């Protein structure tokens, strides 16, 4: 999803495009799923909320479902968008939803861009090395575990 921010009337600034990246705060039994990156090299070994870019013409929640299917092999259900927007490397911004796995779902597996997954309790949330850009969103997601 690309959003355009129009300049104010009379402004000489160019139109800026934002590309939305969706992230999933996948919650289960009071735990949050964290995914360790395996690629690209500059991110490998650090942890994130799974997700990815919204494709042109795709609704953000549909992108979230697609990305979790591609990256984790699960059909998750988006529940609620966590208020806020977190800047990533320009022109990307992160939007995060809480999500859940329907009863009887397969266990998530690290299929794409990740080499390990962990379900973290509130006490364990900060035991992993989160990507700096995900920390504010993780903080918001962790508040929903209480």
Each model region followed by its residue ranges:
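Conserved Nudix-box catalytic region and its N-terminal flanking loop in Nudix hydrolases
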Residues: 31-70
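Active-site-adjacent beta-strand/loop module that shapes the phosphate/pyrophosphate-binding cleft
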Residues: 75-76, 85-108, 118-124, 134, ...
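HhH-family (HhH-GPD) DNA N-glycosylase catalytic core used in base-excision repair
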Residues: 2, 75, 144-146
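Conserved N-terminal beta-strand and adjoining loop/helix that marks the start
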Residues: 2-33, 53
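Short, charged/polar surface micro-motifs in flexible loops or helix N-caps
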Residues: 27-32, 40, 55-56, 74, ...
């Amino acid at each position: 999803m690309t959003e355009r921010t129009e300049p104010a009337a009379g402004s000489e600034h160019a139109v800026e495009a934002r590309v939305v990246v969706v992230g999933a705060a996948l919650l289960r039994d009071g735990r949050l799923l964290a995914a360790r990156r395996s690629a690209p090299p500059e991110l490998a070994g650090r942890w994130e909320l799974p997700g990815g870019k919204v494709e042109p013409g795709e609704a953000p929640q549909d992108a979230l479902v697609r990305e979790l299917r591609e990256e984790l092999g699960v059909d998750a259900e988006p529940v609620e968008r966590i208020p806020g927007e977190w800047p990533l490397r320009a022109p990307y911004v992160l939007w995060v939803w809480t999500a859940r796995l329907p009863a009887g779902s397969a266990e998530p597996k690290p299929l794409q861009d990740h080499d390990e997954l962990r379900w973290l309790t509130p006490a364990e949330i900060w035991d992993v090395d989160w990507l700096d850009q995900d920390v504010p969103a993780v903080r918001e997601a962790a508040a929903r575990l209480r």
